[in-house]
């Protein structure tokens, strides 16, 4: 039975290589069966020719071009393996598979991916360019986190590099740092000033400053600028200017050799006070250039007193206690002797002798005998209205005196005119 006639011959379509052999016997069969239809024979031949052309069209003529390319020379050979390529780009792309080089980096901010081929980078960039995909959202979050971490790491590296490569501070940074230290070196604590003098004698190069930063608890930059300012001031004023400015630096040189003694302290104070009028201009112009917010410029310069000051402090500080100074010493329970208000005067207090150190001994107050009227005198008065006993007044007796009657009633008041009733009570007991 002959195959049914159709518009497409599926046998020829599946087996294109048998087109010539299959069409030969079928043609006489068709012609013998239908000799009266020449048009059908013509259509079958046309259909067979069209079917024979289908396989090259479906395959895109690729096998022919590949066979032709295989014949072309391959001058670009891989140095790491036995493969060869027609073009230089193909060889370069292949070598990157051996070396792991990825020169194509993603330019999206925060994305750190790199690729060895440009087409891979193009395909990856679509993830960032398409905002609707879930992968894009996840990639954005990951990229943002990576960018933040990279930014913090870069900031830490920059701060570290800046700290290690920082040049030494310039001189005009703190011009007035050592003003108060030079103005009042006698009242500064010895430990802080000795540290200041030690750093002033040390080498102030940038490397020495880095080594001293770990061992010193003070601000090394402030000390370095202070030392440089002092050296500049020494060069500016100089010791050759005469003895006028000598006391500015005398105490500092005492501190360099050791702590100043009390005599040196008194001498420096007397020198500074005797030359206060002469050096007033030198101090004022140095204080004027001090910044208002400088932490070192707030300390008062103690040696700059003037002669016409209203302070009762004498010009020369003596080694002994001054005459008008109160006797400052700890008072015991029975040593508080205050004069009564009747014995206080408005005149100037007389000068006391200089107090010498003496051992403290028991200093008890013994009340003097009263010379008031006795009971017989009161009873012998002619007027009856005056024959009355005075109103008894309870004396102010300390609690310890009450507990220790052997010590006597040492009253808190040192008045010599005690009340009659107080003495009577003391005599009764």
Swiss-Prot record:
Protein name: DNA-binding protein creA
Membership in a protein family: Belongs to the creA/MIG C2H2-type zinc-finger protein family.
Native organism taxonomy: Eukaryota, Fungi, Dikarya, Ascomycota, Pezizomycotina
Composition bias, Low complexity: 35-52, 292-306, 406-422
Residue ranges with Polar residues bias: 8-34
Broad class of where this protein is predominantly found: nucleus
Assigned GO CC terms: cytoplasm; nucleus
Localisation: Nucleus
GO biological process, one term: carbon catabolite repression of transcription from RNA polymerase II promoter by glucose
Subunit structure: Interacts with creB.
Keyword annotations: DNA-binding, Metal-binding, Nucleus, Repeat, Repressor, Transcription, Transcription regulation, Ubl conjugation, Zinc, Zinc-finger
Segments of skewed composition (Basic and acidic residues): 275-284
Maturation and modification: Ubiquitinated. Deubiquitinated by creB, probably to control its activity or amount.
Annotated zinc fingers (C2H2-type), start-end: 76-98, 104-128
